[in-house]
Regions:
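Transmembrane-helix motif of ABC transporter permease domains
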Residues: 10-19, 52-77, 81-104, 124-143
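Internal transmembrane helix-loop-helix hairpins in multi-pass membrane proteins, together
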Residues: 42-48, 120-128
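Cytoplasmic membrane-interface regions of multi-pass membrane proteins
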Residues: 1-5, 32-47, 73-88
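N-terminal secretory/membrane targeting signals
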Residues: 1-4, 8-30
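Membrane-helix interface motif
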Residues: 26-43, 104-119
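Intrinsically disordered, low-complexity segments enriched in small/polar residues
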Residues: 25-34, 50, 59-62
């Protein structure tokens, strides 16, 4: 299956591993901070769903798109293949969606702490938390 779906699977996966390693090392070694400083992105991201369109995330989306685009362009030129869009770009999309779902989990966990603190305060101290405060916390999560 790999031979029919991916262009030259051996060199393809080796180059994908090396390219991903270079991209991760660049981002983690300061390239990510450099890019964020370049666009004057704030270090803090919102707790709400707005974090996914904050400048920090938009910079990472652009970085990922450029990395995938350059890798795909190389393979589209080096070894044109009938399934190249599905194999190269489809795999990149699967990886991105997996990362994004993990980030959704992180966002939900970041929201849990203040929300459940409010619930606990409402349960331990009657009439200290108004229904508006509760709805406001839910509204914060929804963006």
């Amino acid at each position: 299956m790999f031979k029919s779906f991916f262009p030259k699977p051996g060199p393809f996966f080796l180059s994908a591993f090396i390219w991903a390693l270079i991209a991760v090392i660049f981002w983690q070694a300061g390239g990510g901070s450099w890019l964020l400083n370049l666009v004057h992105a704030s270090k803090d991201v919102p707790i709400s769903a707005a974090r996914f369109w904050s400048l920090n995330y938009l910079v990472f989306y652009a970085f990922y798109a450029v990395c995938v685009g350059l890798f795909a362009l190389y393979w589209f030129v080096r070894s044109p293949h009938r399934w190249q869009y599905w194999s190269v770009l489809g795999t990149a999309l699967i990886i991105f969606v997996t990362w994004f779902l993990v980030e959704v989990g992180v966002a939900v966990n970041a929201w849990y702490a203040p929300f459940w603190d409010l619930i606990q305060q409402a349960l331990t101290s009657p009439n200290k938390v108004s229904i508006n405060q509760l709805y406001q916390e839910v509204g914060i999560f929804l963006g």
